[in-house]
């Protein structure tokens, strides 16, 4: 098993980092570059940037801040937001991103996953999945979650989409558990465990981190490859060096700070 990854997530809106609860009521958390530099210095393994307004607004990510980040940090980072065609992905990678992530565009055009994998290699292609548990107990996919007014409920079951995304060429899956997002009550171990059983590529957990034990639990119980979090890092509730030390004490292999 490779070292487990600790991944701060930076939701971007109008050139600023924001954070909401269950994908709503976003508040400003700071400057993109300042936060990226802080996480680089504190030992993050990689960063994920989501331009949360891009897909709902029908536009692509702003390449200017991607270039600014790439010039200043030396850790891998992934960019998501409005990447609906190969040339847009090419521009994001050319601006300096190491990986691109697609979510709503992949739902609208599943063949995009294959096209991106063929153009850039599966190692560059991440599929993000926003998932919520419905009244019948099934987890299903949501689309356009960056704007609550445009969010769409789909009949597609989350676990079915995980299988299909891999078949099409996804090199990594980030599972955003919407019921847990921003509430700091722990990752959705039940959902992530079922996803793990079907996921042959790296799986990253997202949504629910509130304390260090939550990270240990998701690594031990769901066997994910990485844990993504936002509010606990942005607020300073958890420091990455302290978290990595805690995880080592729990016999979880992580990279040095």
UniProtKB/Swiss-Prot annotation:
One annotated Gene Ontology cellular component of this protein: cytoplasm
Gene3D superfamilies linked to this entry: Aldolase class I
GO biological process: L-histidine biosynthetic process
Predominant cellular place of this UniProt entry's protein: cytoplasm
SUPFAM superfamilies: Ribulose-phoshate binding barrel (SSF51366)
Subcellular location: Cytoplasm
Active site (catalytic residues): 11, 130
Recorded metabolic or biological pathway in which this protein acts: Amino-acid biosynthesis; L-histidine biosynthesis; L-histidine from 5-phospho-alpha-D-ribose 1-diphosphate: step 5/9
CDD domains assigned to the protein according to its UniProt record, in alphabetical order: HisF
Gene Ontology molecular functions: imidazoleglycerol-phosphate synthase activity; lyase activity
Keyword terms: Amino-acid biosynthesis, Cytoplasm, Histidine biosynthesis, Lyase
Its biological purpose: IGPS catalyzes the conversion of PRFAR and glutamine to IGP, AICAR and glutamate. The HisF subunit catalyzes the cyclization activity that produces IGP and AICAR from PRFAR using the ammonia provided by the HisH subunit.
PANTHER family membership: IMIDAZOLE GLYCEROL PHOSPHATE SYNTHASE HISHF, IMIDAZOLE GLYCEROL PHOSPHATE SYNTHASE SUBUNIT HISF/H IGP SYNTHASE SUBUNIT HISF/H
Binding partners and assembly: Heterodimer of HisH and HisF.
Protein name: Imidazole glycerol phosphate synthase subunit HisF
Organism: Xylella fastidiosa (strain Temecula1 / ATCC 700964)
Gene encoding the protein: hisF
């Amino acid at each position: 098993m490779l070292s487990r990854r600790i991944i701060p997530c930076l939701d971007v809106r109008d050139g600023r980092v924001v954070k909401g609860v269950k994908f709503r009521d976003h508040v400003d958390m700071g400057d993109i570059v300042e936060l990226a530099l802080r996480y680089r210095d504190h030992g993050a393994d990689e960063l994920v940037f989501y331009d949360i307004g891009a897909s709902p607004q029908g536009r692509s990510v702003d390449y200017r801040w991607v270039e600014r980040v790439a010039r200043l940090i030396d850790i891998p980072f992934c960019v998501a937001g409005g990447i609906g065609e190969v040339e847009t992905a090419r521009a994001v990678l050319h601006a300096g991103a190491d990986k691109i992530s697609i979510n709503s565009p992949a739902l609208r055009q599943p063949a995009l996953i294959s096209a991106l994998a063929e153009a850039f290699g599966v190692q560059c292609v991440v599929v993000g999945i926003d998932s919520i548990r419905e009244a019948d107990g099934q987890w299903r996919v949501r689309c356009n979650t960056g704007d609550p007014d445009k969010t769409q409920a789909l009949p597609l079951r989350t676990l079915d989409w995980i299988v299909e995304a891999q078949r099409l060429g996804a090199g990594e899956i980030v599972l955003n558990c919407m019921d847990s997002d921003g509430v700091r009550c722990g990752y959705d171990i039940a959902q992530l465990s079922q996803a793990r059983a079907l996921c042959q590529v790296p799986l990253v957990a997202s949504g629910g981190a509130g304390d260090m034990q939550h990270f240990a639990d998701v690594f031990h119980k769901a066997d994910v490859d990485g844990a993504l979090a936002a509010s606990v890092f942005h607020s300073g509730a958890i420091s990455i060096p302290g978290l990595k030390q805690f995880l080592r004490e729990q016999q979880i292999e992580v990279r040095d700070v």
